[in-house]
């Protein structure tokens, strides 16, 4: 049986629980490579228009081409050709044929870059780092394979030089493919 006291108790305002005090965030002074990467990312965000494109693509012919080229590239470089290098080659060729996409901003000017320098996002312990494959449009698949594998290894070992992280005109990632 429900009595008047039960109804009144139910209707009484509920007191809010105490809000915990905000914790002060930890601040870590950046230096060295981490600072250089942050500076490059900030400059990139300010000067290069950002566009993200995700597409479904039938890669059947690319898979077949890679299978045929694997032994050739590996015998020339000592590295296995991955889809990353094929994507870099395709993007570099496209940017060369569409130079207005290979552009950046400098103040009130649009800069059409003559070099096609592809930034490759590489997962490292503390996040991502983006080494730059210089003049990717002038490299064949074997040279792109050697360059990207070397830069990726140096990135994971924290041995990239600042110049190896500068100058990208376009950045890609294949999301772990």
Predicted region positions:
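C-terminal catalytic/motor cores of large multi-domain enzyme assemblies
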Residues: 1-177
């Amino acid at each position: 049986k429900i009595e008047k006291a039960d109804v009144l108790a139910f209707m009484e305002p509920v007191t809010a629980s105490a809000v915990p005090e905000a914790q002060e965030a930890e601040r870590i002074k950046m230096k060295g490579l981490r600072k250089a990467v942050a500076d490059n990312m900030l400059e990139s965000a300010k000067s290069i228009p950002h566009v993200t494109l995700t597409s479904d693509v039938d890669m059947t012919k690319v898979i077949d081409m890679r299978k045929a080229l694997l032994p050739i590239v590996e015998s020339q470089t000592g590295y296995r050709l991955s889809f990353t290098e094929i994507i870099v080659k395709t993007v570099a060729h496209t940017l060369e044929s569409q130079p207005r996409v290979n552009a950046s901003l400098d103040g009130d000017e649009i800069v059409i870059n003559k070099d096609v320098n592809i930034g490759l996002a590489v997962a490292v312990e503390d996040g991502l780092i983006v080494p730059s494959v210089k003049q990717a449009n002038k490299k064949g698949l074997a040279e792109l394979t050697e360059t990207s594998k070397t830069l990726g290894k140096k990135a994971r070992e924290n041995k990239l030089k600042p110049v190896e992280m500068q100058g990208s005109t376009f950045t890609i990632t294949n999301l772990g493919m």
